A protein has these predicted regions:
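Catalytic core segments in nucleotide and nucleic-acid processing enzymes
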Residues: 12-167
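A short, surface-exposed helix-loop junction/capping segment
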Residues: 1-13
Length: 167
């Protein structure tokens, strides 16, 4: 995430961090969900034109991936709740409190989940490696491989791929 953040600062107007966040979440979800159980779109594809309620729709849960939670996202969460679905916001650590505060200000405290992406991914790596350090790199490698395939399938910039040497 730090590399994506640095690259984004060097290239104003780009959304590297948000793209990496969204596709790593997708890769993690691919690890646990049955194949084709949810759609994966390019990070720049807006929810509205594609008639989606969020970045990922899985059963009655709507996952929103963002590096900058704001009023528009909270409105989407309100719509999700009105439609009987459960919104989850996955964001960077620095924005978790922002999202929680926005949800609280909108009267949604306790009704919208807000997760730090690094904790979300880390917990998965530990769980799938059964907390065995010798298996952790293999699990991480699997997530990164899935991420790289998602980037190749949905994005035009192959430099978004992650190189990882499992040891």
């Amino acid at each position: 995430f730090e590399q994506a953040r640095k690259r984004q600062k060097q290239n104003p107007g780009t959304q590297y961090l948000g793209t990496v966040l969204q596709h790593l979440v997708a890769a993690k979800l691919c690890l646990i969900m049955p194949e084709n159980s949810f759609e994966i779109h390019g990070a720049s594809v807006a929810d509205g034109p594609t008639d989606r309620n969020g970045d990922f729709v899985i059963n009655n849960t709507i996952i929103h991936c963002t590096t900058m939670p704001g009023a528009l996202l909270i409105e989407k969460c309100k719509t999700n709740l009105r439609n009987g679905t459960h919104p989850v916001i996955i964001t960077i650590f620095d924005r978790v409190h922002t999202a929680l505060n926005l949800a609280e200000d909108a009267g949604l405290a306790g009704r919208v989940e807000v997760w730090d992406v690094q904790q979300f991914l880390s917990a998965n790596v530990y769980e799938h490696s059964l907390f065995d350090e010798s298996k952790r790199n293999s699990t991480l490698s699997d997530i990164i491989s899935r991420y790289n395939n998602i980037v190749l399938d949905t994005e035009t910039d192959p430099s978004l791929r992650i190189e990882f040497d499992a040891k």
